[in-house]
Structures are given as structure tokens and as C-alpha cells.
Amino acid sequence: MKQDMIVILDLGSHENTVLARAIRALGVYSEIYPHDITVEELKALPNVKGIIINGGLNNVIDGVAIDVNPSIYTMGIPVMAAGHDKATCAVKLPAFTDDIEAIKAAIKSFVFDTCQAEANWNMANFVNDQIELIRRQVGDKKVLLALSGGVDSSVVAALLLKAIGENLVCVHVNHGLMRKGESEDVVEVFSNQLKANLVYVDVTDRFLDKLAGVEDPEQKRKIIGGEFIRVFEEEARKLDGIDFLGQGTIYPDIVESGTKTAKMVKSHHNVGGLPEDLKFQLVEPLRQLFKDEVRACGLELGLPYEMVYRQPFPGPGLGVRCLGAITRDRLEAVRESDAILREEFQIAGLDKKVWQYFTVVPDFKSVGVRDNARSFDWPVIIRAVNTVDAMTATIEPVDWPILMKITDRILKEVKNVNRVCYDMSPKPNATIEWE
């Protein structure tokens, strides 16, 4: 089903994604394009009902003020100016105002009254459209997907499975740095329930041997990332007839790579680093979706709520939460204490309130008392933060009775631990993760 679209032209505003999300929340599809898109390129886009120019005229590139192609105003498509002073625009929206409701009302009026757009953007339509597109792109060929168990790769797997069934080959690499029960969940959901073609590779010893004695966080990340690519490459070479590589690229990955006007936040990468002789065509069915839409897509596809709303998890896994050189006893302490924290937050209803929460175990011990004797064991540090964009973060003021219950369980149930601390550091100055 072809949905109506509102195009946002980027003139250097930091609010592009906020604007796109606001329009999508109205049930109308929206995408961000560079300011110098041509009329021909705009005409080639499907069902464009309106254009929003977002940003001021004070932005420059190489000393030259930037603006949109003036021919856009003669296309016969309504144009709104958001913080852009053009008399030719149908509607003007102030760039800075405290009246959020007035802005929402103006956007809604432009989308529905001025542009006459139809609210036909929803997950059911998206899933059906993507299934059709995937089948058209892939045909009867096979797709290889690295299935980590995270939200993005899980939703991609479920969507590809709906589209091409047994022609999807998933590879799950258990590097020994997963959260408790995570690999088992992947096998249960995708292999046992959804009957996916799943290759499960347990390389725990291989990874932990490579990481032995490595203290530097960046070096740990490089070892984990590099070894993952090598394992994935080895498994890919064992498989015949693979022409496509599925990836969990989402819309913020594309936007954050930057346009000519917006500063690049980070270079986009996903399952990169494969040798050049493994030439796959990419299948990226989620590249249009924001993170909350990815979760909605997962629910639409029937994935378990717990999998779709899984906590954000760093690529190196628990490897950067077992601080310093990774040892098996401290890694187990991180895994067990993290499981207790997640269970108790779920019981208390905090799992739906707190953006991210986890435990870390540092590479030092403290003196304590256990069974009327001196102990010398590891501390566990709890971290729970709230954020909108992960650029800044505040600390969740967890009630004392909940913290005391979590502490009691960790001290009783986790081996080699005699102390529990709560990290009170906001971002800035501290980052969300410790390493």
C-alpha cells in the first residue's frame, strides 16, 4: 500500500527527527532529505503531499549560505517553512516557541488541511509492504542474518521469516558475554517457536581466551568485534547459495550519518568488516523506522514483549561491564547480579519506567564479613538512568525498600560478592556505561 508522505528538507536544524516523528505519530509517513534535492528527485518520490523546509537561512557551507532549490515552490505541492523566512511558503512555523501545543496544531493542520494527506502509515501496512518488497528483492535466494538477540536483529529476523521462510539463515554467536538466558531465549523463540533456520555457535572459550589479561576497554571492544566478524565469516563460508545479507539498520543510523547540512554524529556501520570476497547484497527492511517503531513492528510480527522491549545492550556485551581484565568468576557475578536486578525491576514496575539499568563488577575487592569470618570479595555496582537521546542522563531515584531487596538478594545469591553500591553519577560527567 502506497502511503502519503511529507518530505522534510534539512537546512541544518537539530529538530528534523523530532519533526519527522511528530508527523508519523499522526499516521502520516515522513522522511528527511538534503536541502539541495532536485525537483526531479522529489517528483520520483511516491505520494509526496507536502514539503517542510526545516532550518534557518543563517546556515552556511564553505562560507556560502544554503537554501533549497527555488523550483520547489512551483511544483504545486504545499510548502511549510519551519524557522525559514520564505514568502512563497504556504505556511510558516516559528523556529523557537514555548507553545508546543500550538506547534503540534500547526503541523497537524498543514498535514491534513493544507496537504490533504491521508493517515495510512501504520505497522500493519508497513509489515505487509515490506514482505512484498523483500520477496521482490530476494526472490527464491537465501539471506544470511547475524541474530544477536537484540531488538533490531530480532525484528529483522521475524520480518524476513514472514517473507521468505526457510530461505532465511540466522547465525547466533554466543561469545560468552551474553546476559543470563539470552542465547537460550534466541533458540527458544526463533528455532523452537518460529521454526527458523538457526545456526547456533558457542564460542565462549575462544572469546574468553582471547580476552584473558586485557584491561583496556577499547582493546577489549576491538578484540570482541574482530573475533565476532571472524566467527561470522567462518560460518558464512560453510553455507552455500547465500546471496543476501540481512542487517538491522534503522532510520536513526541513516540520519546520524549526516546530510550535507547536518553534522555527522557517527559513521553508520552494522555487520561491517566482512572480507571483500564475501559479496552480499544488503537487505535492510527496517531502515525507514525509528526505534519505537521497530518495537511496534516486533509486536505486530508476534515477537514476545520481553524480547521487543529488551534493555539496550552494548555490542561487546558484558565484556564492558566486567571492568578491567575479564575473569570468569567476575563475569558470572555480573551475569547473575544483572539478572536479579532485571527481575526485581520488573516486579516493581520499574522496567517500563527506567530507560536503562544494569550492574557492573569492578576489578578490585573489598573487605567484608561472611559466616562470622573475614571475606575479601567483589563489589557489585547498580546503575539505573533515564534519558531521551542518550546524550545526557539522569539517575532514577529508586525507592530504598526496592534497593534493599535487590541488595539482599545479590549478597545471598551471587558468589564472591560482599558489597552492593548504587551509582549516583549523571551524564555528564559520567557516561552511561562504565567502559
From Swiss-Prot:
Signal sequence, renumbered to the chain: none
Catalytic reactions on record: XMP + L-glutamine + ATP + H2O = GMP + L-glutamate + AMP + diphosphate + 2 H(+)
Entry GO terms, CC: cytosol
GO biological processes: GMP biosynthetic process
Residue ranges of domain GMPS ATP-PPase in the record: 121-310
Domain of life: Bacteria
Amino-acid positions noted as binding ATP in the UniProt annotation, renumbered to this chain: S148, G149, G150, V151, D152, S153, S154
GO molecular function: ATP binding; GMP synthase activity
EC number: 6.3.5.2
Function in brief: Catalyzes the synthesis of GMP from XMP.
Protein name from the UniProt record: Putative GMP synthase [glutamine-hydrolyzing] 2
Gene coding for it: guaA2
